[in-house]
């Protein structure tokens, strides 16, 4: 039984490894395919949130603001507001900015300011708005 359990764990690691390689190679679409089982609602929340942030960051870095906004929005909408929440708010604002949606950016950054008034990303957002 223990060997069987180890085999299952090893099999689950493979798509994670391949997905991370795809991310490092600059291919978030391929990474998202490998990550599908880990992005499901019933997946372990910390892994799911980390992978969604990694995908969102990769999309944003490559200028795919719409895809990035989708992942950031999902992270923000999750019931468990973890350590990614301030970065997701800030980055969603950046994605909206790239899309030319300045009013949406300002709404998201206002939420960042209200909930995390002393966070460094709040100060960065305030500077970006000037």
Language-model segment annotations:
Residues 6-8, 39-47, 76-84, 113-125:
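Short solvent-exposed coil/turn linkers within tandem alpha-helical repeat scaffolds
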Residues 1-25, 32-34:
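Acidic, proline-/serine-/threonine-rich low-complexity intrinsically disordered segments
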